């Protein structure tokens, strides 16, 4: 079975034998309900370090719900309940002895719509470090420069650090939000449709940034854009009706999917 997807180009990479990468998140038999709505069903999925893992699927399939479960943001909805296990670095994130604040220092998040605080660029980046007790001006200055460089936006903003973040373009705001995430030195970055509100040029910059960031971070990205998933990810999971239909190397999923439902989705027969 060979899927032909219009305008989707997968990365052409040579196969090089390397040691297996460590598992960052190991999800085992995860089920989640919103009240009576069974939103995630028996999810089993391992996410590896220094890779970009894309999650694709039609609207309402559970992509964003799963993403927000990885840092327990989903618990902000009072009617949520879960069964199963998600291990982060071999520690169950649902364990009552695991403070959610600690988890979120390791697992940062970038949202669909850029959401800078109504503060200066400098204050946006230093917000997280200050919450964690860093007050030294020299240290904060270093964090700001390192984070903005990490988000590939230092040269654009270095002379505007005390300007209000609302004065930035949409693409700049999103990269500022990525810098704000980097400032707390996370291990994993979750991205929920990070380019859906951006123009093509800004989207390209964010995609290029993601490729750089995976050298130091593990990235999980939810996207409706299959072309984007094919361009930037190492592995892709296809969700449908709250289930993982297929999870494999991105090249394989987009060229030789093993499940007919995957082929039907990526070739546009539904979605």
Swiss-Prot record:
Catalysed reactions listed for this entry: phosphate(out) + ATP + H2O = ADP + 2 phosphate(in) + H(+)
SMART domains linked to this entry: AAA
Keyword Transmembrane helix in annotation: no
Domain named ABC transporter: residues: 25-266
GO MF entries: ATP binding; ATP hydrolysis activity; ATPase-coupled phosphate ion transmembrane transporter activity
GO cellular component, one term: plasma membrane
UniProt keyword annotations, A-Z: ATP-binding, Cell membrane, Membrane, Nucleotide-binding, Phosphate transport, Translocase, Transport
Subunit structure: The complex is composed of two ATP-binding proteins (PstB), two transmembrane proteins (PstC and PstA) and a solute-binding protein (PstS).
Function field: Part of the ABC transporter complex PstSACB involved in phosphate import. Responsible for energy coupling to the transport system.
Protein name per UniProt: Phosphate import ATP-binding protein PstB
Species whose genome carries this gene: Bacillus cereus (strain ATCC 14579 / DSM 31 / CCUG 7414 / JCM 2152 / NBRC 15305 / NCIMB 9373 / NCTC 2599 / NRRL B-3711)
